[in-house]
Amino acid sequence: TQIFDLAFISASCAIVVECGKLIAAGKSFDEIVEILPSIQSRIKVYYVLETLTYLIKGGRIGKVAGIVGELLKLKPIISINDEGTYYTYSKVRGRNKSIAKLAEIAHDALMKAKSKIWVLHGGALEDGKALYDTISKLPNISEINFGDISPVLGVHTGPGLLGIVIMKDN
């Protein structure tokens, strides 16, 4: 038995799929355990919320900061560092700009390396489909997928989450 901290909720399925591919390729348990950190290091996660309300209610951000953010229509683009800590990667004003920023982040990553992309949503199907359509036209995509976020993440963010998971190819 081996325990491996993925450090993020939303991209865990990507790692499970990669492990499945390694098993199919005949890799042993020990070889897969050895490879896991390199898989994790190739994954970046970015997401944006439609509202800050649920972060305020959950105590993830202060009430004053959240209310000011809502009034200014600030949309933080949230990412996760290598230690699993969530941080504000960027801030934009308005939903449309936040969706465009996610597409820009995907574009910039794909210009650096061929990658697999997952477009994820939590109660934002139409926005998610639009983001998927935009990103799917970008070069250097080895694989693109679309789906729902983990309910564990949705509990903290509420409806309206959009996210992208970028995994650089080997």
Predicted regions: what is each one?
Residues 1, 7-170:
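Mixed-charge interfacial surface used for oligomerization/domain docking
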